[in-house]
């Protein structure tokens, strides 16, 4: 039987087993959580991250902070990946999911020290998570239809409250909801809101409140030549992922020419190859050509003569979205299976109008009325790159929240209301269990209170006092049927009191809380199951002389 502690293995590595590795993992997880803890909530503080090149990021987005950290400890990496997963799945709640996971681990470690087996704790945590999710959907969530559009705006504002655009949440809340509703898609009776169709552009200057929402897809490019039309009605769009520069022979190919006069023919052929490609695209009916590569100045004349609009050096990510919105196919090559080159009209996308407009101080290409899917664009204004980047992250998080609310239509009250309600419910539920899992469920219940505690302490309030009051409110709501309305009670961090957060409009998607609980529990269980760490030493490369031994 392996003893706890370190032992040297025969395969030149270090082994840590038993309680030693468990404590190490918990320490690493708590260290990660402590980094982001002070950034939670509407009055959370920002972090300044400077990378090895000297680039600066100022943010309080949990996923962004952890992404920039080079975490070496394996247990720490699990929490970093957890924040990324929450960011991808929900978009918001990345900080709280890490804090809850670390708290669950800390409490599980205490139970293990009291000789409770990890398997018992894992079963208890799974049971607690299952009951908590059930309780959220049955008792403390409500539909957005009961309040209407304002509930969606409030959820967006709650998401923004902790961000740089928090002071302008009223303005940005409406902006984000309008942007999400503009990309609504109905397919076989199912309504979805693909927020990837919302393009977010950043422009220096003016104030944040002068950001604008543009109907249509905005492309941060201009036409390749001023002689081209700046407006094209009934646009047929070719999306190309190759360059329309003069064709050059590949390196390593040499042509022996004895007659100098033939050099000109080779040069002309290099130009004619591209010319023929452009002819094929224009003959297919294209009157707008967007390409990720360059367009040779000699070729621009063809586009001007045919009255087509050409835009070069577009981002590939933009072209993919435009292709999806207009029904075009992003073409990588004109080569056919027969070895010829051809361009079919079926590869073209369609839009009502494409126009180059001046918005704020920049010229942009706007694609209006795309045929396959609607699109919208948000142009953010701000003082500098650091501010604009953080605004973009904030808007992305809010868009994700709005999508979740519009698709699931389920909301919960914010400000620690859900966590406190769940904590009291699970405490009562734990007392109904006669097995050892009771201890784990009770610890799970206590761990959830970390969220209201951190929210209060970040706002420079007395967390013990506020959380005690909050527990009293929720206890009454669960025990006295006439006081059920108290289940919406949450923290008011500005006044340092308790209030009805449903009335106050502090709302979050129920899905965000459910996924957050599930992810945090699974991450804690993953780390808790580890009882042995074997770290192999780096193998020394064999010396030059050893090969000839």
Curated annotation (Swiss-Prot):
A Pfam family it matches: Cpn60_TCP1
For this UniProt record, the keywords arranged alphabetically read as follows:
ATP-binding, Chaperone, Cytoplasm, Nucleotide-binding
GO terms, molecular function: ATP binding; ATP hydrolysis activity; ATP-dependent protein folding chaperone; unfolded protein binding
Give the highest taxon in the source lineage: Eukaryota
Report the record's Gene Ontology biological process terms.
protein folding
* The keyword Chaperone belongs to this UniProt entry's keyword annotation: yes
Subcellular location as annotated: Cytoplasm
Is Cytoplasm included in the keywords of this UniProt record?
yes
GO CC terms in record: chaperonin-containing T-complex; nucleus
Q: NCBIfam families this protein is in?
A: chap_CCT_alpha, thermosome_alpha, thermosome_beta
Record-stated family: Belongs to the TCP-1 chaperonin family.
Question: How does this chain assemble?
Answer: Heterooligomeric complex of about 850 to 900 kDa that forms two stacked rings, 12 to 16 nm in diameter.
User: Briefly, what is this protein's role?
Assistant: Molecular chaperone; assists the folding of proteins upon ATP hydrolysis. Known to play a role, in vitro, in the folding of actin and tubulin.
Give the PANTHER family listed for this entry: CHAPERONIN
Write down what this protein is called. Answer: T-complex protein 1 subunit alpha
- Corresponding gene? cct-1
